[in-house]
Amino acid sequence: MSWGKLSPKANNVMIICHALSGSADVSDWWGPLLGPGKAFDTDKFFVVCMNSLGSPYGTASPVTAKNGDYSQGWYGADFPSTTIRDDVRLHKLVLDKLGVRKVAAVIGGSMGGMHVLEWAFFGKDYVRCIVPAATSSHQSAWAIGWGEAQRHAIRSDVKYKNGRYGFDDPPILGLEAARMTALLTYRSRDSLERRFGRDTGNKKKTQQQDSKTIPNNGTPIHSQGGADETPVAFDRADSNFAAQSYLRYQAKKFSDRFDSNCYIALTNKLDTHDLARGRTRTIAEALSLIQQPTLVLGIRSDGLYTLAEQEQIARAVPNAKLREIVSDDGHDAFLIEWSQLNWLLIGFLHENLPDIMQRAAL
Protein backbone atom coordinates (compact mmCIF):
# COMPACT_ATOMS: atom_id res chain seq x y z
CA MET A 1 0.00 0.00 0.00
CA SER A 2 1.11 3.58 -0.49
CA TRP A 3 0.32 7.10 0.68
CA GLY A 4 1.46 10.45 -0.66
CA LYS A 5 3.05 11.17 -4.03
CA LEU A 6 6.28 10.11 -5.67
CA SER A 7 8.41 13.19 -6.36
CA PRO A 8 9.45 14.07 -9.93
CA LYS A 9 12.96 12.82 -9.11
CA ALA A 10 11.51 9.60 -7.61
CA ASN A 11 13.67 10.03 -4.51
CA ASN A 12 11.23 10.70 -1.65
CA VAL A 13 10.25 7.11 -0.87
CA MET A 14 9.79 6.13 2.77
CA ILE A 15 9.52 2.37 3.29
CA ILE A 16 7.65 1.15 6.37
CA CYS A 17 8.27 -2.51 7.27
CA HIS A 18 5.57 -4.41 9.16
CA ALA A 19 6.04 -6.84 12.04
CA LEU A 20 5.18 -10.54 12.22
CA SER A 21 1.39 -10.50 12.07
CA GLY A 22 0.88 -7.10 10.48
CA SER A 23 -0.15 -6.11 6.98
CA ALA A 24 0.80 -3.46 4.46
CA ASP A 25 -1.85 -1.10 5.87
CA VAL A 26 0.26 1.14 8.09
CA SER A 27 -2.84 3.06 9.17
CA ASP A 28 -4.00 0.01 11.13
CA TRP A 29 -0.97 -0.28 13.39
CA TRP A 30 1.07 2.94 13.13
CA GLY A 31 -1.81 5.21 12.16
CA PRO A 32 -0.94 8.03 14.61
CA LEU A 33 2.43 8.40 12.82
CA LEU A 34 0.94 8.60 9.32
CA GLY A 35 -0.25 11.82 7.71
CA PRO A 36 0.64 15.47 7.05
CA GLY A 37 2.93 16.94 9.69
CA LYS A 38 3.59 13.55 11.30
CA ALA A 39 6.66 11.32 11.13
CA PHE A 40 5.35 9.57 8.03
CA ASP A 41 4.49 12.88 6.38
CA THR A 42 2.34 12.14 3.34
CA ASP A 43 2.77 15.72 2.09
CA LYS A 44 6.50 15.13 1.67
CA PHE A 45 7.10 11.40 1.41
CA PHE A 46 5.81 8.65 -0.83
CA VAL A 47 5.13 6.18 1.99
CA VAL A 48 5.18 2.53 0.93
CA CYS A 49 4.57 -0.69 2.86
CA MET A 50 4.74 -4.12 1.23
CA ASN A 51 3.71 -7.48 2.62
CA SER A 52 6.22 -10.16 3.51
CA LEU A 53 6.21 -13.55 1.87
CA GLY A 54 4.27 -15.94 4.09
CA SER A 55 1.86 -13.30 5.37
CA PRO A 56 -1.84 -14.04 4.77
CA TYR A 57 -2.47 -10.39 3.87
CA GLY A 58 -0.75 -10.24 0.51
CA THR A 59 2.18 -11.15 -1.78
CA ALA A 60 2.27 -14.99 -1.57
CA SER A 61 1.78 -17.34 1.36
CA PRO A 62 0.46 -20.74 2.43
CA VAL A 63 -3.09 -19.48 1.75
CA THR A 64 -2.25 -18.53 -1.85
CA ALA A 65 -4.08 -20.60 -4.48
CA LYS A 66 -1.95 -22.95 -6.54
CA ASN A 67 -1.58 -21.54 -10.05
CA GLY A 68 -4.04 -18.84 -9.01
CA ASP A 69 -6.88 -21.36 -8.90
CA TYR A 70 -8.37 -22.48 -5.58
CA SER A 71 -9.96 -25.48 -7.29
CA GLN A 72 -6.39 -26.81 -7.42
CA GLY A 73 -5.96 -26.15 -3.71
CA TRP A 74 -3.55 -23.83 -1.92
CA TYR A 75 0.08 -24.12 -0.96
CA GLY A 76 -0.47 -24.78 2.74
CA ALA A 77 2.47 -26.55 4.35
CA ASP A 78 4.12 -26.88 0.91
CA PHE A 79 4.78 -23.15 0.73
CA PRO A 80 8.57 -22.79 0.40
CA SER A 81 10.73 -21.37 3.16
CA THR A 82 11.60 -17.71 2.73
CA THR A 83 13.97 -15.33 4.47
CA ILE A 84 13.98 -11.70 5.53
CA ARG A 85 16.50 -11.13 2.75
CA ASP A 86 14.12 -12.68 0.19
CA ASP A 87 11.42 -10.19 1.20
CA VAL A 88 13.71 -7.21 0.79
CA ARG A 89 14.98 -8.34 -2.59
CA LEU A 90 11.42 -8.88 -3.78
CA HIS A 91 10.29 -5.48 -2.51
CA LYS A 92 13.27 -3.85 -4.24
CA LEU A 93 12.00 -5.30 -7.54
CA VAL A 94 8.65 -3.61 -6.90
CA LEU A 95 10.35 -0.25 -6.39
CA ASP A 96 12.42 -0.78 -9.53
CA LYS A 97 9.20 -1.39 -11.45
CA LEU A 98 7.80 1.88 -10.07
CA GLY A 99 10.88 3.74 -11.24
CA VAL A 100 12.14 4.58 -7.75
CA ARG A 101 15.70 5.90 -7.92
CA LYS A 102 16.44 6.43 -4.26
CA VAL A 103 14.88 5.53 -0.91
CA ALA A 104 14.89 8.37 1.59
CA ALA A 105 14.24 6.29 4.72
CA VAL A 106 13.38 2.77 5.84
CA ILE A 107 11.61 2.38 9.19
CA GLY A 108 10.27 -0.68 11.00
CA GLY A 109 10.07 -2.55 14.29
CA SER A 110 10.50 -6.15 15.41
CA MET A 111 10.48 -8.31 12.24
CA GLY A 112 10.15 -5.04 10.35
CA GLY A 113 13.38 -3.88 11.96
CA MET A 114 15.13 -6.92 10.53
CA HIS A 115 13.93 -5.87 7.08
CA VAL A 116 15.20 -2.35 7.75
CA LEU A 117 18.71 -3.62 8.46
CA GLU A 118 18.70 -5.74 5.30
CA TRP A 119 17.63 -2.73 3.21
CA ALA A 120 20.79 -0.94 4.33
CA PHE A 121 22.96 -3.36 2.36
CA PHE A 122 21.79 -1.85 -0.92
CA GLY A 123 24.15 0.97 0.02
CA LYS A 124 23.93 4.58 1.11
CA ASP A 125 23.62 5.82 -2.47
CA TYR A 126 20.27 4.02 -2.70
CA VAL A 127 19.00 4.05 0.92
CA ARG A 128 19.76 7.34 2.66
CA CYS A 129 18.89 6.54 6.30
CA ILE A 130 17.33 3.80 8.40
CA VAL A 131 15.44 3.36 11.68
CA PRO A 132 15.38 -0.19 13.13
CA ALA A 133 13.29 -0.48 16.31
CA ALA A 134 13.07 -3.25 18.91
CA THR A 135 14.80 -5.75 16.66
CA SER A 136 18.03 -7.71 16.28
CA SER A 137 20.99 -8.23 14.00
CA HIS A 138 20.30 -11.96 14.17
CA GLN A 139 17.63 -14.11 15.75
CA SER A 140 18.84 -15.08 19.21
CA ALA A 141 18.56 -18.53 20.77
CA TRP A 142 16.04 -16.99 23.18
CA ALA A 143 13.78 -15.80 20.37
CA ILE A 144 14.24 -19.05 18.42
CA GLY A 145 13.09 -20.95 21.49
CA TRP A 146 9.93 -18.86 21.87
CA GLY A 147 9.14 -19.36 18.19
CA GLU A 148 9.55 -23.11 18.46
CA ALA A 149 7.24 -23.25 21.48
CA GLN A 150 4.59 -21.44 19.45
CA ARG A 151 5.00 -23.71 16.42
CA HIS A 152 4.81 -26.76 18.66
CA ALA A 153 1.49 -25.53 20.05
CA ILE A 154 0.07 -25.33 16.52
CA ARG A 155 1.43 -28.70 15.42
CA SER A 156 0.06 -30.33 18.57
CA ASP A 157 -3.49 -29.42 17.59
CA VAL A 158 -5.14 -32.59 16.25
CA LYS A 159 -6.67 -30.51 13.47
CA TYR A 160 -3.31 -29.38 12.15
CA LYS A 161 -2.86 -32.64 10.19
CA ASN A 162 0.73 -31.87 9.19
CA GLY A 163 -0.50 -28.63 7.66
CA ARG A 164 -3.06 -30.35 5.40
CA TYR A 165 -6.13 -28.85 7.06
CA GLY A 166 -9.00 -27.13 5.28
CA PHE A 167 -10.08 -23.52 5.62
CA ASP A 168 -13.41 -24.76 6.97
CA ASP A 169 -11.86 -26.56 9.95
CA PRO A 170 -8.45 -25.07 10.83
CA PRO A 171 -6.38 -25.80 13.97
CA ILE A 172 -7.77 -22.86 15.91
CA LEU A 173 -6.84 -24.04 19.41
CA GLY A 174 -3.20 -24.54 18.49
CA LEU A 175 -3.01 -21.11 16.89
CA GLU A 176 -4.65 -19.53 19.92
CA ALA A 177 -2.16 -21.21 22.26
CA ALA A 178 0.68 -19.91 20.09
CA ARG A 179 -0.76 -16.42 20.22
CA MET A 180 -1.09 -16.49 24.01
CA THR A 181 2.55 -17.50 24.29
CA ALA A 182 3.61 -14.74 21.92
CA LEU A 183 1.58 -12.10 23.74
CA LEU A 184 3.50 -12.80 26.94
CA THR A 185 6.74 -12.03 25.10
CA TYR A 186 5.32 -8.79 23.69
CA ARG A 187 4.51 -7.35 27.11
CA SER A 188 6.41 -7.21 30.38
CA ARG A 189 5.65 -8.57 33.82
CA ASP A 190 5.20 -5.07 35.21
CA SER A 191 2.87 -4.11 32.37
CA LEU A 192 0.52 -7.03 33.02
CA GLU A 193 0.75 -6.63 36.78
CA ARG A 194 -0.17 -2.97 36.55
CA ARG A 195 -3.06 -3.63 34.20
CA PHE A 196 -4.55 -6.75 35.79
CA GLY A 197 -2.85 -7.75 39.03
CA ARG A 198 -5.00 -10.42 40.66
CA ASP A 199 -8.19 -8.77 39.56
CA THR A 200 -10.97 -11.22 38.90
CA GLY A 201 -12.89 -8.33 37.41
CA ASN A 202 -16.45 -7.72 36.49
CA LYS A 203 -17.21 -9.63 33.27
CA LYS A 204 -18.99 -6.69 31.65
CA LYS A 205 -16.22 -4.34 32.70
CA THR A 206 -13.60 -6.75 31.37
CA GLN A 207 -15.42 -6.95 28.04
CA GLN A 208 -15.55 -3.18 27.74
CA GLN A 209 -11.95 -2.57 28.70
CA ASP A 210 -10.12 -5.52 27.22
CA SER A 211 -12.31 -7.12 24.58
CA LYS A 212 -12.80 -3.98 22.53
CA THR A 213 -13.16 -5.26 18.97
CA ILE A 214 -12.30 -7.81 16.35
CA PRO A 215 -10.98 -6.19 13.16
CA ASN A 216 -12.91 -7.66 10.25
CA ASN A 217 -10.21 -6.72 7.78
CA GLY A 218 -7.79 -6.95 10.64
CA THR A 219 -4.17 -6.14 10.58
CA PRO A 220 -3.01 -4.93 14.00
CA ILE A 221 0.35 -6.42 14.74
CA HIS A 222 0.93 -7.28 18.36
CA SER A 223 -1.45 -4.90 20.09
CA GLN A 224 -5.20 -4.80 19.76
CA GLY A 225 -7.02 -2.28 17.62
CA GLY A 226 -8.18 -1.89 14.05
CA ALA A 227 -10.39 -0.01 11.68
CA ASP A 228 -13.52 -2.17 11.66
CA GLU A 229 -15.13 -2.62 15.06
CA THR A 230 -17.40 -5.53 15.90
CA PRO A 231 -18.33 -5.91 19.60
CA VAL A 232 -17.51 -9.34 20.95
CA ALA A 233 -18.80 -11.08 24.05
CA PHE A 234 -16.42 -13.30 25.99
CA ASP A 235 -17.52 -15.67 28.71
CA ARG A 236 -15.64 -18.62 30.17
CA ALA A 237 -16.66 -20.22 33.44
CA ASP A 238 -13.02 -20.96 34.27
CA SER A 239 -11.79 -17.41 33.61
CA ASN A 240 -11.10 -16.51 37.21
CA PHE A 241 -8.63 -13.71 36.54
CA ALA A 242 -8.68 -10.72 34.25
CA ALA A 243 -5.27 -11.72 32.86
CA GLN A 244 -6.74 -15.04 31.72
CA SER A 245 -9.69 -13.34 30.09
CA TYR A 246 -7.38 -10.94 28.29
CA LEU A 247 -5.19 -13.70 26.85
CA ARG A 248 -8.14 -15.83 25.76
CA TYR A 249 -9.91 -12.94 24.13
CA GLN A 250 -6.81 -11.75 22.27
CA ALA A 251 -6.08 -15.31 21.13
CA LYS A 252 -9.60 -15.70 19.76
CA LYS A 253 -9.40 -12.36 18.00
CA PHE A 254 -6.15 -13.44 16.39
CA SER A 255 -7.36 -16.85 15.25
CA ASP A 256 -10.27 -15.15 13.49
CA ARG A 257 -7.86 -13.22 11.26
CA PHE A 258 -4.77 -15.39 10.82
CA ASP A 259 -3.70 -18.76 9.44
CA SER A 260 -1.65 -21.42 11.21
CA ASN A 261 0.59 -22.34 8.27
CA CYS A 262 1.27 -18.65 7.72
CA TYR A 263 2.21 -18.28 11.37
CA ILE A 264 4.66 -21.18 11.10
CA ALA A 265 6.12 -19.79 7.86
CA LEU A 266 6.67 -16.35 9.36
CA THR A 267 8.20 -17.55 12.63
CA ASN A 268 10.54 -19.82 10.66
CA LYS A 269 11.48 -16.77 8.60
CA LEU A 270 12.47 -14.93 11.78
CA ASP A 271 14.81 -17.78 12.70
CA THR A 272 16.74 -17.39 9.42
CA HIS A 273 17.60 -13.78 10.21
CA ASP A 274 21.36 -13.29 10.41
CA LEU A 275 23.01 -10.25 8.85
CA ALA A 276 26.36 -12.06 8.72
CA ARG A 277 25.04 -15.01 6.70
CA GLY A 278 26.86 -15.12 3.38
CA ARG A 279 28.52 -11.76 4.07
CA THR A 280 31.03 -11.76 6.90
CA ARG A 281 32.51 -13.92 9.62
CA THR A 282 30.85 -12.03 12.47
CA ILE A 283 27.77 -9.95 13.17
CA ALA A 284 29.92 -6.98 14.16
CA GLU A 285 31.66 -7.08 10.78
CA ALA A 286 28.31 -7.19 8.98
CA LEU A 287 26.96 -4.25 10.97
CA SER A 288 30.12 -2.25 10.26
CA LEU A 289 29.22 -2.38 6.55
CA ILE A 290 26.08 -0.30 7.17
CA GLN A 291 27.07 3.25 6.28
CA GLN A 292 23.75 5.11 6.47
CA PRO A 293 22.79 7.42 9.32
CA THR A 294 20.96 5.05 11.65
CA LEU A 295 18.57 5.66 14.52
CA VAL A 296 18.32 2.54 16.68
CA LEU A 297 15.29 2.49 18.98
CA GLY A 298 15.30 0.23 22.03
CA ILE A 299 13.04 -0.49 24.99
CA ARG A 300 14.52 -1.26 28.39
CA SER A 301 11.53 -3.44 29.38
CA ASP A 302 11.64 -5.47 26.13
CA GLY A 303 12.24 -9.11 27.02
CA LEU A 304 12.08 -10.42 23.44
CA TYR A 305 14.51 -8.17 21.54
CA THR A 306 16.41 -6.72 24.44
CA LEU A 307 17.93 -3.29 24.87
CA ALA A 308 21.34 -5.01 24.88
CA GLU A 309 20.67 -6.17 21.31
CA GLN A 310 19.90 -2.62 20.25
CA GLU A 311 23.08 -1.43 21.95
CA GLN A 312 25.04 -4.03 19.98
CA ILE A 313 23.64 -2.67 16.71
CA ALA A 314 24.30 0.95 17.66
CA ARG A 315 27.90 0.20 18.71
CA ALA A 316 28.80 -1.62 15.51
CA VAL A 317 27.09 0.59 12.91
CA PRO A 318 29.52 3.46 12.25
CA ASN A 319 26.95 6.25 11.94
CA ALA A 320 24.35 5.08 14.45
CA LYS A 321 22.83 6.51 17.57
CA LEU A 322 20.66 4.75 20.13
CA ARG A 323 17.55 6.27 21.63
CA GLU A 324 15.32 4.65 24.21
CA ILE A 325 11.53 4.42 24.05
CA VAL A 326 10.64 4.89 27.72
CA SER A 327 7.94 2.40 28.69
CA ASP A 328 7.30 -0.56 30.95
CA ASP A 329 5.03 -2.16 28.32
CA GLY A 330 7.79 -4.36 26.94
CA HIS A 331 8.33 -5.16 23.28
CA ASP A 332 4.96 -3.72 22.25
CA ALA A 333 6.02 -0.23 23.30
CA PHE A 334 7.15 0.45 19.73
CA LEU A 335 3.48 0.13 18.74
CA ILE A 336 2.10 2.04 21.72
CA GLU A 337 4.32 5.01 22.52
CA TRP A 338 3.28 7.05 19.50
CA SER A 339 4.14 10.49 20.86
CA GLN A 340 7.69 9.41 21.70
CA LEU A 341 8.10 7.76 18.32
CA ASN A 342 6.76 10.77 16.46
CA TRP A 343 9.17 13.10 18.25
CA LEU A 344 12.20 10.84 17.80
CA LEU A 345 11.51 10.13 14.14
CA ILE A 346 10.76 13.70 13.11
CA GLY A 347 13.98 14.91 14.75
CA PHE A 348 16.03 12.24 12.99
CA LEU A 349 14.43 12.92 9.62
CA HIS A 350 14.99 16.68 9.91
CA GLU A 351 18.64 16.03 10.72
CA ASN A 352 19.29 13.62 7.86
CA LEU A 353 16.74 14.54 5.17
CA PRO A 354 16.53 18.36 5.36
CA ASP A 355 15.97 18.64 1.60
CA ILE A 356 12.72 16.67 1.95
CA MET A 357 11.59 17.78 5.40
CA GLN A 358 11.95 21.51 4.69
CA ARG A 359 10.39 21.66 1.25
CA ALA A 360 6.78 22.48 0.47
CA ALA A 361 4.15 19.78 0.20
CA LEU A 362 4.03 17.90 -3.08
Swiss-Prot record:
InterPro entries: AB_hydrolase_1 (IPR000073), AB_hydrolase_fold (IPR029058), HAT_MetX-like (IPR008220). Gene3D superfamilies: alpha/beta hydrolase. It comes from the Eukaryota. The keyword Cell membrane does not apply. GO terms for molecular function: homoserine O-acetyltransferase activity. It catalyses: L-homoserine + acetyl-CoA = O-acetyl-L-homoserine + CoA. It is an enzyme of class 2 (transferase). Its EC number is 2.3.1.31. The keyword Transferase applies. Coiled coil: none annotated. The active site is at S110 (nucleophile), D302, H331. Homoserine O-acetyltransferase; part of the gene cluster that mediates the biosynthesis of fusaric acid, a mycotoxin with low to moderate toxicity to animals and humans, but with high phytotoxic properties. L-aspartate is suggested as fusaric acid amino acid precursor that is activated and further processed to O-acetyl-L-homoserine by cluster enzymes aspartate kinase FUB3 and homoserine O-acetyltransferase FUB5, as well as enzymes of the primary metabolism. Belongs to the AB hydrolase superfamily. MetX family. This is Homoserine O-acetyltransferase FUB5. The gene is FUB5.
